[in-house]
A protein has these predicted regions:
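Acidic catalytic loop of the alpha/beta-hydrolase fold
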Residues: 190-194, 271-273
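Short substrate-entry loop that stabilizes the transition state in hydrolases
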Residues: 23-74, 142-143, 272-273
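Post-His helix in hydrolase/transferase enzymes
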Residues: 275-281
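Alpha/beta-hydrolase active-site loop
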Residues: 75-97
Length: 306
């Protein structure tokens, strides 16, 4: 694996870029834009969803940036970040060469997942290029209801003040359902949601069959990171210190055009417990099994038009 730091020429903003070692000329890669959640940064997200551990094995290129806005908590905002994210993706595509990008995925934790949905629903650039969306507790197409006590430990006054501040800035507003075509994988911790729906409107859209439970993914090693601010008073929904774990995997088979639609639930886990090695790899396997080609098709069409 090779790790580089991308520096945006306009803003000076930095981004982690993880690439596979020994890329051969013309070798295909899967490109992942990995977005952190509210109150987080790129460094934390890179450890929470450590796709970099698998860039060599699955020939991934993973870009993990940080949002610009810091108040009331660091978060992605359209006016502060969308142009930057487009420029970031363009810089990576220029570096790689568009013809070698087999697939392009958005991955986002929490508000980063909500931002992924907003980009897919409201930004032609991403709708036209993204082949898939991995929502890491960032919302489900066909919602999974949040647990009633979801969130970090706060007094009622603290919770109310935070909700009012975020509402004023539209930080956690859910975007419309995208109309673009893409594969969709939802992953959540058991304690974050009341229950996982047993149907999926996204699967129905692609004519996929009823969900099939796959073999559980069992990890004997913990994740790399968690929200240590609340170690003295953790909640199940927000998450505790990382531990080994088991995840249930559900796949909706035979979606049109090979689209991958899947749900993954980590048992006895909350919102901020970093992903364990095996469940991380399982998510990546699902991603690379999905069809791609949008970036390549746009590049080809542009070349023909030119």
């Amino acid at each position: 694996m090779e790790t580089d730091t991308l520096v945006d020429a306009k803003t000076g903003r930095k981004c982690y870029l993880d690439l596979p070692s020994g890329l051969a000329p013309g070798e295909e890669v899967t490109f992942v834009l990995n977005l952190h959640g509210g109150g987080s940064v790129g460094h934390w997200q890179r450890e929470y969803f450590p796709a970099y551990d698998y860039v060599d094995k699955y020939r991934l290129v993973v870009a993990t940036p940080s949002a610009a806005t810091k108040e009331p908590t660091r978060h992605w905002a359209a006016d502060a970040d969308d142009d930057y994210l487009v420029d970031l993706v363009e810089s990576v595509l220029d570096r790689l060469g568009r013809s070698r990008v087999r697939a392009f995925w958005l991955a986002g934790h929490s508000q980063g997942g909500m931002t992924s949905q907003r980009l897919l629903a409201g930004t032609d650039y991403f709708a036209d290029r993204a082949d898939g969306w991995l929502s890491l507790s960032g919302g489900r197409l066909g919602p999974a209801e949040r647990s009633p006590d979801f969130g970090p430990p706060r007094t009622e006054e603290e919770r109310t003040a935070f909700e009012e501040a975020t509402a004023r800035r539209d930080v956690f507003q859910r975007a419309p359902t995208p109309t673009a075509d893409f594969s969709f994988i939802f992953r959540a911790g058991e304690h974050e949601i009341t229950s996982l729906p047993d149907t999926s409107p996204w699967a129905e859209r692609y004519g996929a069959g009823p969900r099939i439970r796959q073999a559980d993914v069992v990890d004997d090693q913990p994740g790399k990171i968690h929200d240590a601010r609340y170690d003295a008073n953790p909640t199940l929904s927000w998450g505790r210190k990382p531990t080994p774990g088991t995840a249930q995997v559900y796949v909706y088979p035979n979606g049109r055009d090979g689209r991958v639609i899947a749900d993954v639930v980590r048992l006895d886990k909350g919102h901020t417990e970093g992903l364990e090695p095996c469940v991380t790899e399982e998510l990546i396997k699902l991603m690379v099994s999905a069809p791609g080609g949008k970036v390549r098709a746009l590049s080809s069409a542009s070349a023909q038009a030119g």
